[in-house]
């Protein structure tokens, strides 16, 4: 009753006058502060107050609009049962007692809210369009000096509340119609009645019974309305308690992407998404990690990154029990567990469990939008170019905690860790061989099936692995994108560059556990280990000769086929092995990169340096089982064994003479061809053997052996 009397006084009425029933106004649920109390609130408390007041107002308006749309105007037929909706908008009240320190921002928000019943317009009916328009005038011009410490309720009574629309809904039946006519005549601030028709089939909400004027039920139902979401999306069925939220939600359904990137033309639903996207072009990364200094373009990325340092994993999978640091990783894992692949390619019907995988599936378009500024190589994924850049920078961010070895990619580190654990979980069903990586097992399966999926477009040569095709392609086109920063030498493969770098550093990280011999390549170590076991699984189909390595068998096969695919561009000489061609190139260039630390003598081949070192150490590791004779070189032992067996594998095609060594055959062949490749730089005399040239040099130098 006190609240009702106060409301009547603010409207200039006496306490005993009748008021329209069933109307709950904003002031009835407003939280009130005096000016002194308001000054005691901090910014966060004021922001909270603003949100609560706006939410209350939206809920009240939702109730009011839904009630209004449930009524209709029926033209009078003289029977006295006409239903009329009267909408009165209170005129502005000029008042100088309101302070804009509290409600100014709330008022702006309220003025921006629009309530529209658009369904009626689509059906061709006249629809109620009640808009709360932004007002100009009194509230922004009020003087704080007149506000004093009066309660905000009193200040808002004459000014702020007059801006809020008071929508009075009455049902004219008997005496209620007379009350309506009387109340409207007594209210000087109410404008002319506006008749608005609604859909006839619209039913009145059951929340208030059959009588919309039953004000006694309204206070009890207030809490229900605060939670009510009366704005529903026709597409998804999702409900909202504010029309602005509904409109924002409907943008993706309508296809209205109004924010366009000026650089790439990409469209976005919201302005903040465009702002985040712009950082891709500007490379702006304002968010920095305090732990490692890494920067990010989005704050959410920084938040996810921090979990790497803290080790926090908040997202738990109910299927497999795995925990993840990011929700996106959990969603991906769930798709793997369920086998769900909801993202499908329209071209080839291939399905993916991630949207990003479908986006990266650019096989049909051939699109590669990401280009490396160093070598002009193009990529289909941004993540691929980021990892590619580490080749040029030499960055190796992934380090093994056991042996401190660093790697360019995380996959390399994961693969390396299995060396320490010796875990080989992938087993071949054909031969029982186990592998530490699934990709290795897949490649191994191709050896059994003879499958060669990767074919060269130039020469139609097929390969088992994609890396083999890439290597072959670079040989054909002569491309060498990998350059050594020390000597400027270029290579067709990154692995060759890494091996080459060990020449400058002298690094040999791979050590044999049996004899403690060290190697610069892992493949060399693996080959060496087979020497200890004596295992030779690779057998030649022509001569039944067995080899410890597949590469040795491949080299041997070329002896039978006579294939020499590697050709020198200088002298057109061909070779059966690439390594032979590389060594041959040094004959033309005069390069001798391998130097002895003892006597500073240089060599064009690493093997020659190793053999030379045995002169200083006196080491002779190769022993004949027949006579016990030892040798510095493996080739010397092989040739020696032929003395016991009498084998002479190398035969001259002209005179049928046979030799123990290939070098002896080459020397003999020069007798028939009269070739003299060894020339003296002093006098120009030529010789058919290197030893003859060396002997001739002593004439000029005066050296006596």
Curated annotation (Swiss-Prot):
A zinc finger (C2H2-type) spans 231-253, 259-281, 287-309, 315-337, 343-364, 370-392, 398-420, 426-448, 454-476, 482-504, 510-532, 538-560, 566-588, 594-616, 622-644, 650-672, 678-700. It comes from Homo sapiens. One of its GO terms (cellular component) is nucleus. The keyword Nucleus applies. InterPro entries: KRAB (IPR001909), KRAB_dom_sf (IPR036051), Znf_C2H2-type (IPR050758), Znf_C2H2_sf (IPR036236), Znf_C2H2_type (IPR013087). CDD domains: KRAB_A-box. It is found in: Nucleus. Its main location: nucleus. GO terms for molecular function: DNA-binding transcription factor activity, RNA polymerase II-specific; RNA polymerase II cis-regulatory region sequence-specific DNA binding; zinc ion binding. GO terms for biological process: regulation of transcription by RNA polymerase II. May be involved in transcriptional regulation. Transmembrane segments: none annotated. Belongs to the krueppel C2H2-type zinc-finger protein family. Residues 24-97 form the KRAB domain. This is Zinc finger protein 611. Keywords: DNA-binding, Isopeptide bond, Metal-binding, Nucleus, Repeat, Transcription, Transcription regulation, Ubl conjugation, Zinc, Zinc-finger. There is a cross-link at residues 173, 221 (Glycyl lysine isopeptide (Lys-Gly) (interchain with G-Cter in SUMO2)).
């Amino acid at each position: 009753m006190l609240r009702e009397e106060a409301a009547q006084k603010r409207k200039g009425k006496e306490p005993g006058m009748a008021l329209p029933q069933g109307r709950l106004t904003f002031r009835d649920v407003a939280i009130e502060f005096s000016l002194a109390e308001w000054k005691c609130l901090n910014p966060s408390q004021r922001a909270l107050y603003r949100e609560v007041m706006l939410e209350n107002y939206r809920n009240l308006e939702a109730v009011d609009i839904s009630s209004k749309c449930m009524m209709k105007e029926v033209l009078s037929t003289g029977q006295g049962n006409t239903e009329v909706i009267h909408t009165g908008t209170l005129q502005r009240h000029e008042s100088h007692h309101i302070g804009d320190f509290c409600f100014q921002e709330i008022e702006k928000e309220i003025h921006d809210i629009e309530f529209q019943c658009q369904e009626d317009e689509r059906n061709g009916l006249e629809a109620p369009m009640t808009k709360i328009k932004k007002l100009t005038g009194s509230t922004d011009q009020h003087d704080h000096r007149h506000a004093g410490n009066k309660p905000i309720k009193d200040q808002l009574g004459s000014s702020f509340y007059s801006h809020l629309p008071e929508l009075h809904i009455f049902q004219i039946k008997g005496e209620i119609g007379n009350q309506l006519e009387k109340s409207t005549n007594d209210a000087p601030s109410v404008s002319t009645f506006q008749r608005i028709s609604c859909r006839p089939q619209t039913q009145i909400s059951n929340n208030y019974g059959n009588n919309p004027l039953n004000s006694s039920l309204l206070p009890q139902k207030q809490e229900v309305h605060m939670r009510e979401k009366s704005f529903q999306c026709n597409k998804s069925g999702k409900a909202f308690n504010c029309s602005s939220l509904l409109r924002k939600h409907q943008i993706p359904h309508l296809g209205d992407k109004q924010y366009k990137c000026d650089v790439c033309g990409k469209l976005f639903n919201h302005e903040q998404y465009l702002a985040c996207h712009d950082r891709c072009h500007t490379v702006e990364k304002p968010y920095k990690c305090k732990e490692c200094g890494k920067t990010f373009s989005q704050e959410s990325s920084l938040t996810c990154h921090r979990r790497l340092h803290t080790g926090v994993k908040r997202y738990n999978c109910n299927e497999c029990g795995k925990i993840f640091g990011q929700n996106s990783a959990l969603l991906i894992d769930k798709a793997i567990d369920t086998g769900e692949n909801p993202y499908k390619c329209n071209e080839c019907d291939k399905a993916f469990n991630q949207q990003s995988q479908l986006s990266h599936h650019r096989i049909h378009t051939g699109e590669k939008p990401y280009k490396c500024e160093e070598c002009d190589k193009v990529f289909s994924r941004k993540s691929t170019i980021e990892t590619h850049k580490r080749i040029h920078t030499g960055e190796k961010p992934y380090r093994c905690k056991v042996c401190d070895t660093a790697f360019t990619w995380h996959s390399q580190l994961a693969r390396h860790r299995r060396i320490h654990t010796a875990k080989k979980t992938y087993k071949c069903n054909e031969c029982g061989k186990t592998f530490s990586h699934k990709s290795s097992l897949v490649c191994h399966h191709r050896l059994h099936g003879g499958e060669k999926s990767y074919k060269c477009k130039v020469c139609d040569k097929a390969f088992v692995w994609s890396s083999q095709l890439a290597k072959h392609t670079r040989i054909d086109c002569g491309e060498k994108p990998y350059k050594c920063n020390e000597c400027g030498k270029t290579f067709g493969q990154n692995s060759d560059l890494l091996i080459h770098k060990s020449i400058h550093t002298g690094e040999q990280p791979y050590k044999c556990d049996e004899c403690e011999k060290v190697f610069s390549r892992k493949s060399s170590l693996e080959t060496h280990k087979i020497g200890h076991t004596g295992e030779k699984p690779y057998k030649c189909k022509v001569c039944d000769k067995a080899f410890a390595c597949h590469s040795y068998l491949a080299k041997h096969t070329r002896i039978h086929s006579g294939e020499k695919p590697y050709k020198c561009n200088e002298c057109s000489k061909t070779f059966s092995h690439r390594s032979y061609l590389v060594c041959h190139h040094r004959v033309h260039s005069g390069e001798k990169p391998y130097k002895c630390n003892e006597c500073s003598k240089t060599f064009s081949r690493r093997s020659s340096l190793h053999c030379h070192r045995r002169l200083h150490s006196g080491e002779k590791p190769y022993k004949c089982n027949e006579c016990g004779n030892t040798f510095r070189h493996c080739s010397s032992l092989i040739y020696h064994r032929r003395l016991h067996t009498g084998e002479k594998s190398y035969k001259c095609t002209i005179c049928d003479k046979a030799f123990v060594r290939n070098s002896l055959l080459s020397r003999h062949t020069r007798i028939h061809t009269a070739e003299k490749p060894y020339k003296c730089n002093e006098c120009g005399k030529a010789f058919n053997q290197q030893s003859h040239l060396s002997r001739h040099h002593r004439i000029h130098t005066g050296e006596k052996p």
